[in-house]
Amino acid sequence: EDPYKCLCGLARVGFKTADSILLELERESINNIKNGKTPIIEFSCDLKTSKQRCLSCVLYLLEENENDGHTVMNIVDLRNQCMKLTPACSDLFVDCIKHESIIYDKDTMCVSLKSTYETESAIAETIIDGLKNNISWDYDIEKYRIIDNDCELSDEQIKILEYICKYNICILNGSGGTGKTFSTQAIIHMLKDNNKSYELFSPTGKAAKVLSENTNENAS
């Protein structure tokens, strides 16, 4: 019923490749019928103008958007890109964003994959619950300004220790070379000195290895 879902969703073929394959199969099948031959495959609709094609295009664009590090996409940008890739069926765009696998927020005019939206919502709820039950620590963070008798944390770097003492949930963010590793080492020293348990986790095996090497601690 839905060849695009079969190829893109089940076989994990990229949309552009799947689109090219399916449209070519449709063209060859139509030519076979015209020439009195058996079609290679019969589709239930005109694929080029079908809702299945438009929906697969929208899902592809949202997934590519996530691969670029974004979890939402402006509906105007999404529609413009959809029109470029599949102009023949872009008039079905509005119907497609009503699909059960897609979330559209009218207030922000943003579109996202439902699975991602639900994941982010769950994370947000966990963070909010954590912040509602803060347990503060009264530690002298200045004791941890010097790392390994060599490196001195800047005021900005040591700020994370203050936040950790005040809030249950903190985010240490920064581009490469900004000193996140030194701040992390200071955090570990502070936790150890005050008999606090901790675990080091990373999103990938490679990142875990780097974290372990930089802190001389086990990380997973």
Which ranges hold each PLM region?
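Conserved ATP-binding/catalytic motifs of P-loop helicase motor domains
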Residues: 1-220
